[in-house]
Amino acid sequence: MLPDLSAAPMQDRYGRPLRDLRLSVIEACNFRCGYCMPADRVPDDYGLDADQRLSFDQLETLVRAFVAVGVTKLRLTGGEPLLRKNLPVLIQRLAAIEGIEDLALTTNGALLARQAVALRQAGLRRITVSMDALEPALFRQMSGGRGEIDQVLAGIAAAEQAGFKRLKINCVVQRDVNEDQVLPLVEHFRGTGHVLRFIEFMDVGSCNGWRPEAVVTSAQLRDRIHARWPLAPLDANYTGEVAQRHAFADGLGEVGFVSSVSVPFCGDCQRARVSADGHLYTCLFASQGHDLKPALAEGEQGLATHLRQRWSVRADRYSEVRASTSRRRKPVEMFLIGG
């Protein structure tokens, strides 16, 4: 049994606690989206080798240790997490851990229709679906020729039927690529109870061809949407929430904006990321990870102690200093640590 560490909250060098864990369960993905895992840079069979992947036992021990040092929110990512064999079994084990207040999953939605019921029954509480276009040909193109929008929409419908009533729908907007999909997406999801969120194109990884000119800022997107459907700002749901929330003035739901490039939120970042092979990344824009497997072999107690030590020296604030920083190390790819 791990000791109660609530009396001594863990903080990094800037006084930021650790509350949110993004845990990748697999590196493989069935899509090849250009801003994450472009087909010309990543082979089709990438990430399918399970030799280095943490087992379910290891993942449960890891999550228990993170809970012991303050984590209350857990999100499963990939790659595409629904490719992980027997994922509902893992979710059932993680959902049973005392202290986990929110258990969510991010998916491209292509496999969601066949798994939605099992995910709900296992204890998954929330789902986020990535969707960068509604137009079928553009959606297929942006997924590297792998995705069909009808499959994703069917997955969302199946999730609703399974009991997931308030999904988040994430759209990464790139200038001259899918800008014209913004208003159609808003029109489609307004009034459904789901929350559409627009994410600025970020310089995560080194193979997505990022350049500042390709960024459509949240302010620009908000103005476009507001001109069609008036918006009013909402307060954050919790400290460290990444999306700026706005309600539709007519009461038909809300829309969110994630502004990592134009309005950095490093100051409130309470998130850590762990890759499928057990490496800790304390920032989405990190250039290298820290292997947790040796500490994991010591069990919950040993790993919890190790995590406290690692977090106490954390000083990441890349988005705040992006303009004045020249990278000398290759940043980790998004598909290794999720979004």
Curated annotation (Swiss-Prot):
Pfam family, one: Fer4_12
Enzyme class: lyase
PROSITE patterns for this protein: MOAA_NIFB_PQQE, RADICAL_SAM
Domain Radical SAM core stretches: 13-249
Family as reported in the entry's similarity comment: Belongs to the radical SAM superfamily. MoaA family.
Quaternary data: Monomer and homodimer.
Listed PANTHER family: MOLYBDENUM COFACTOR BIOSYNTHESIS PROTEIN 1, MOLYBDOPTERIN COFACTOR SYNTHESIS PROTEIN A
Function: Catalyzes the cyclization of GTP to (8S)-3',8-cyclo-7,8-dihydroguanosine 5'-triphosphate.
Protein name as catalogued: GTP 3',8-cyclase
